[in-house]
Amino acid sequence: MEFKIVETSLNLRVERRLGKQNNDYLLSKDVAEEQLKLDADVYCNVEYMECQDKKYMEAFETAGYTAYKALDSYNQRGVMYMVKNDYPVKVIHMFEEPHMMHIQLNKEGTIFNLITVRILISGSDDADYQSRKEQWDKVLNYIDSLENKDNLCITGDFNHGVISEAYKEDQSRRFFNYQMLVDTLRERNISLAPIEGMSYKGYMKIDHLAVCDNLHVLEAEYLDVFGEHRIIGVPDHSMIVARVEAV
């Protein structure tokens, strides 16, 4: 049994220093229409936020999807899944820091465990990267606690920074980096899907798809349909588009 998954960073945030509030921002129907062209079984959205999103939500509802959200209490911001109505969904758990949501999706009798994560960032200094590592450890501890890890798929924005072969003593990334992500997942028999290219600003590969041993990634790619811009509410990362099969 296979399913199609799309991960998107919706690029929503509140500019509180400018006196803005959630309703000052728009998540438009145009964004929904671009996502819906991909006809995924499930859309895993990070950087979602309660805002002016009525037409966006209506577009998915009309197309036959149900929204499942895990939002923080401060900004009403976090993870949102859109899942085809054909598939029963069970919400398992969520975190506010990092943003994380775990659901189980039942496709024709096959249960898929989906975890979507966004590691939160602040100033890119040592303390920030230490916090990112603590957030990732929290996710790992949660994975370790699961009794049922069958058909486990993890996706999202892991915010480990630029990938280097080594990290100097004066680089904050020494506290949390791509290699740590790969190694800690491998220790749990979870591997990153190889995806060509970069996912953010043309030089960072921080959005990933990871699967357990009994899932096979049939194909996975970064897809950029929104271009370069600075518009809040329009995705600024490449989407991950993938087909995954239970074996």
Stretches with model-predicted labels:
Residues Q135-H160:
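His/acidic metal-ligating clusters that form di-metal
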Residues N11-R13, M49, P88, R118-L120, ...:
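Catalytic metal-binding/acid-base residues of hydrolase active sites
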Residues R16-K20, V91, R118-W136, V162, ...:
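Surface-exposed cleft-lining segments at the edges of enzyme active sites
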Residues V42-I121, E221-L223:
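Structured beta-strand-rich core segments of catalytic domains in phosphoester-bond hydrolases
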Residues H93, L146, H160-V247:
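Metal-dependent phosphoester-hydrolase catalytic domains
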Residues Y43-E47, Y68-A70, C153-D157, S191-I195:
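Active-site neighborhood of phospho(di)ester-bond hydrolases with catalytic His/Asp-centered motifs
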Residues M1-E61, V247:
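N-terminal, active-site-proximal structural segment of metallo-dependent hydrolase catalytic domains
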Residues I103, I115, Y129-D144:
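Internal catalytic-core helix/loop-beta-alpha segment
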